[in-house]
């Protein structure tokens, strides 16, 4: 209902659109553009100046961050190169130590082999000497046993030989 009242009042006061372009629109547009240029120039200039300053500050900050990042990158690349050199040095030192340890182990193994050979040789020599001594003892015992046997046989068969042997033995001991 309010809308109906509003429409009724508009018709009464002749409120409506004037369709004559020359009378209304060009003048209105000129006034609006003039007001916008007069008041908007300062506001637009200030806004554009502020925006230009913000952009310049952002560019300067970005350039500073880029320089800082480039410096950090250079430092990190230098650290990486040093770390690679250190790793290569450590690797080389480890290879040298491994080679020395290998050579030391080989030398110790050779010494142990030589020691075992000498021990085996000494054991063999000792065993040979023991065997030879044992054989000599057996041969001596057998020879004595055989000589005793032969002596008993001769003495029991030959009384004259027995007397001669007793006389010689007494003479040797300092008898007659």
From Swiss-Prot:
Q: What membrane topology does the annotation report for this chain?
A: Single-pass membrane protein
Name where it's found. Cellular thylakoid membrane
GO MF, one annotated term: proton-transporting ATP synthase activity, rotational mechanism
Stretches that traverse the bilayer: 26-45
InterPro entries linked: ATP_synth_b/b'su_bac/chlpt
> Entry's HAMAP family?
ATP_synth_b_bprime (MF_01398)
UniProt subunit comment:
F-type ATPases have 2 components, F(1) - the catalytic core - and F(0) - the membrane proton channel. F(1) has five subunits: alpha(3), beta(3), gamma(1), delta(1), epsilon(1). F(0) has four main subunits: a(1), b(1), b'(1) and c(10-14). The alpha and beta chains form an alternating ring which encloses part of the gamma chain. F(1) is attached to F(0) by a central stalk formed by the gamma and epsilon chains, while a peripheral stalk is formed by the delta, b and b' chains.
Q: What is this protein called?
A: ATP synthase subunit b
Native species? Synechococcus sp. (strain PCC 6716)
Gene this chain is encoded by: atpF
């Amino acid at each position: 209902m309010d809308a109906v009242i509003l429409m009724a009042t508009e018709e009464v006061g002749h409120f409506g659109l004037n369709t004559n372009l020359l009378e209304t629109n060009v003048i209105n547009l000129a006034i609006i553009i003039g007001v916008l240029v007069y008041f908007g120039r300062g506001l637009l200039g200030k806004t554009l100046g502020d925006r230009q300053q913000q952009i310049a500050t952002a560019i300067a900050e970005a350039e500073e961050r880029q320089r800082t990042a480039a410096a950090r990158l250079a430092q990190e690349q230098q650290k990486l190169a040093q770390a690679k050199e250190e790793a290569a040095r450590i690797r080389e030192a480890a290879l040298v130590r491994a080679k020395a340890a290998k050579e030391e182990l080989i030398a110790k193994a050779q010494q142990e082999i030589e020691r075992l050979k000498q021990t085996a040789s000494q054991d063999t020599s000792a065993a040979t000497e023991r065997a030879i001594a044992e054989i000599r003892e057996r041969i001596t015992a057998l020879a004595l046993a055989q000589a005793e046997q032969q002596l008993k046989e001769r003495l029991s068969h030959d009384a004259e030989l027995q007397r001669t042997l007793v006389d010689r033995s007494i003479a040797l001991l300092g008898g007659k």
